[in-house]
From Swiss-Prot:
Up-regulation conditions: Up-regulated under Pi starvation conditions.
The protein's name in its UniProt record: Protein PHOSPHATE STARVATION RESPONSE 3
Name of the gene encoding the protein in the UniProt record: PHR3
UniProt keyword terms in alphabetical order: DNA-binding, Nucleus, Transcription, Transcription regulation
Residue ranges, compositional bias (Polar residues): 402-412
Bias (Basic and acidic residues) ranges: 327-337, 419-428, 438-467
Keyword Isomerase listed: no
Function: Transcription factor involved in phosphate starvation signaling. Binds to P1BS, an imperfect palindromic sequence 5'-GNATATNC-3', to promote the expression of inorganic phosphate (Pi) starvation-responsive genes. Functionally redundant with PHR1 and PHR2 in regulating Pi starvation response and Pi homeostasis.
Subcellular location: Nucleus
Positions of the UniProt region annotated as Disordered: 227-266, 327-353, 400-467
Pfam families the UniProt entry points to: Myb_CC_LHEQLE, Myb_DNA-binding
Length: 467
C-alpha cells in the first residue's frame, strides 16, 4: 500500500500545451477518509459525490500554459450559488496575466491530516479556496472579471483540443459527463455583468443605488434586471467562447468614454446660406475678434443651432481669415515684382537712349546754325569788297576821261601860245610821270586791298571747314 501510482494525463496536440504528470501517493488504510462534495449546476438539484483521500500529497504542475489554465477547472463548486471559476482564479491566480504564452508554476500541498479533517468538516476540497460571503460576491466577481477577460484570447486559441482536455480532466476527477448548464442566455448575462463591473471599476461609477453617482444602467438605458442576475459558470467551452469576446469589452468601453466625454452634440452641415448668415452676424458684431458665440447665436436665430456649433465655426473663421500667405502666393508676387522691375529697367534704358539721341541731334543742329551764321557773314563781307572795287574802278575811269579831254583841248589852241604851250607841255610832261607814278601807286594799293579782302573770306571759309 506504500507504493505510488502515477496517473499520466494525455498529452495535448496544441503547440503551447505541455504534458503534465501527477504523482499521488497511495494513502495508508488508517488515514483514508471520504469527503462528499455537492455540485449545484445553475440551480439544478442533481449532485454528484466525489471521494478524495489525501494525507500529505504534493501536487506539482511542471508547466501550465495560459491557454490550458482556464480549462483545468471547468466545473464549479457552489454552496451559495456562486462561481467557483472566479473563486479559483481569484485565490490562485490573482497576479495579473501579461501574455498568453506565460507559464505558471503552482505547488499546492497539505501538510498534515488535520487539514483533511478540517476539509471534511467544511465540505470543501483542500486545494480550493473558501467561498466568499454574500456581501463579498460583488467584489470577487469584479476582480475575477479582469482575469477572465484577459484569458479570452487563450480560450479562442484552444481549438478542437477542448473536448479531449475536458474529458481527460473529468476522467481524472471522476466527474460525470452530464454536467451541463443553462446555455447561451446565462452566459450572455454573466458576460454583460462582468463588463459592467469592469467598467464601473475603471470609471469609478457605482452599480448600485447606494451612492449619489449615476448608475451604469441609467447611462446605457439598460433595464436593472440584468444587473441582478445570478452569476453562473459554464463548462461548455463553445458557449464561453461565443459569449466572452474582447470586441464587446472594447465596444462598451469606447461607448462609455464617448458617452461621458461628449455632450451628445448633434452634427450640423454648414450650407452657404447658413454661412452667409453667420458672416452677416459677425460683421454686425464688429468683426470676428469682437464677436462672441452667444451674440452670433442670438443674431442668427436658427433652429437646431447650438453655441458649440457657433464656437467651433467662429474659431475656424478666425483662423481662415488671418492665415499667413502661402509660399506659392509669395513666389507669384516675387515673380510679378521681378517682371515689373525688369520692365522698368528696360523703359529706363530706352528713355536714356532717346534722351542721348535728342541731345546729339540738338548739338548737330546748333553746329549747323553756327556754320550758317559764318557763311552769312562771309557773304556780307564779299559783297562789301565788291562794292569797294567797283567804286575804285569808276574813279579810275573818270580820271582817264579827264586826262583825255585835257589832251584834246590843248591840241586846238593857237601857235602863239606855242612856247607857252611847250613850257606848259614840259611842265605837264614833268608832272605827268609824277601823276602816273601816283596813279600806279594808288592802283597798287587798291589791288593789294582787294587781294587782302579776297584772301580774308578764303581764310574764313577754310576756318569754317576746319571747324
Amino acid at each position: 500500500m506504500s507504493t505510488q501510482s502515477v496517473i499520466a494525463v494525455k498529452q495535448f496536440s496544441g503547440p503551447d500545451k505541455i504534458a503534465q504528470a501527477y504523482t499521488v501517493p497511495q494513502p495508508s488504510a488508517h488515514v483514508l477518509s471520504n469527503a462528499n462534495y455537492d455540485y449545484d449546476l445553475c440551480g439544478s438539484t442533481n449532485s454528484t459525490s466525489l471521494s478524495c483521500a489525501i494525507q500529505s500529497s504534493n501536487i506539482k504542475t511542471e508547466s501550465i500554459s495560459s491557454s490550458s489554465l482556464p480549462k483545468i477547472l471547468p466545473f464549479s463548486t457552489d454552496s451559495n450559488g456562486e462561481s467557483s471559476l472566479s473563486r479559483m482564479s481569484q485565490a490562485e491566480f490573482s497576479d495579473p496575466i501579461l501574455s498568453s504564452s506565460s507559464t505558471f508554476c503552482t505547488s499546492l500541498y497539505t501538510s498534515s491530516p488535520m487539514n483533511s479533517g478540517s476539509c471534511r468538516k467544511t465540505g470543501y476540497l483542500p486545494f480550493l479556496p473558501q467561498p466568499p460571503k454574500c456581501e463579498q460576491q460583488q467584489n470577487s466577481a469584479g476582480q475575477s472579471s479582469s482575469s477572465l477577460m484577459l484569458l479570452d484570447a487563450d480560450l479562442r486559441n484552444s481549438g478542437h483540443a477542448d473536448d479531449e482536455h475536458t474529458d481527460d480532466l473529468k476522467d481524472f476527477l471522476n466527474l460525470s459527463s452530464d454536467c451541463s448548464f443553462h446555455g447561451k442566455c446565462s452566459a450572455m448575462a454573466y458576460n454583460e455583468q462582468m463588463e459592467f463591473q469592469f467598467l464601473s471599476e475603471q470609471l469609478g461609477i457605482a452599480i448600485s443605488n447606494n451612492e449619489e453617482s449615476p448608475r451604469l444602467d441609467d447611462i446605457y438605458d439598460r433595464p436593472p434586471q440584468l444587473m441582478s442576475l445570478p452569476v453562473s459558470s459554464c463548462s461548455d467551452q463553445e458557449d464561453l467562447q461565443d459569449a466572452r469576446s474582447p470586441a464587446k469589452v472594447q465596444l462598451s468601453s469606447s461607448r462609455s468614454s464617448s458617452g461621458t466625454a461628449s455632450c451628445n452634440k448633434p452634427r450640423l452641415r454648414w450650407t452657404p446660406e447658413l454661412h452667409e448668415r453667420f458672416v452677416d452676424a459677425v460683421n454686425k458684431l464688429e468683426g470676428p475678434e469682437k464677436a462672441t458665440p452667444k451674440g452670433v447665436l442670438k443674431l442668427m436665430k436658427v433652429e437646431g443651432l447650438t453655441i458649440y456649433h457657433i464656437k467651433s465655426h467662429l474659431q475656424k473663421y478666425r483662423l481662415a481669415k488671418y492665415l499667413p500667405e502661402t509660399k506659392e502666393d509669395k513666389k507669384q508676387e516675387e515673380k510679378k515684382t521681378k517682371s515689373v522691375a525688369n520692365g522698368n529697367d528696360h523703359a529706363k534704358k530706352k528713355s536714356a537712349q532717346m534722351a542721348e539721341a535728342l541731345r546729339m541731334q540738338m548739338e548737330v543742329q546748333k553746329q549747323l546754325h553756327e556754320q550758317l551764321e559764318v557763311q552769312r557773314q562771309l557773304q556780307l563781307r564779299i559783297e562789301e569788297h565788291a562794292r569797294y572795287l567797283q567804286k575804285i574802278l569808276e574813279e579810275q575811269q573818270k580820271a582817264r576821261e579827264s586826262i583825255s579831254s585835257m589832251t584834246s583841248t590843248t591840241e586846238g589852241e593857237s601857235p602863239e601860245f606855242a612856247p607857252m604851250e611847250k613850257t606848259e607841255d614840259k611842265a605837264e610832261t614833268s608832272s605827268a610821270p609824277l601823276s602816273k607814278c601816283r596813279i600806279t601807286d594808288t592802283d597798287a594799293e587798291c589791288h593789294s586791298k582787294v587781294d587782302n579782302k579776297k584772301t580774308k573770306p578764303q581764310a574764313d571759309l577754310e576756318m569754317v571747314h576746319d571747324e
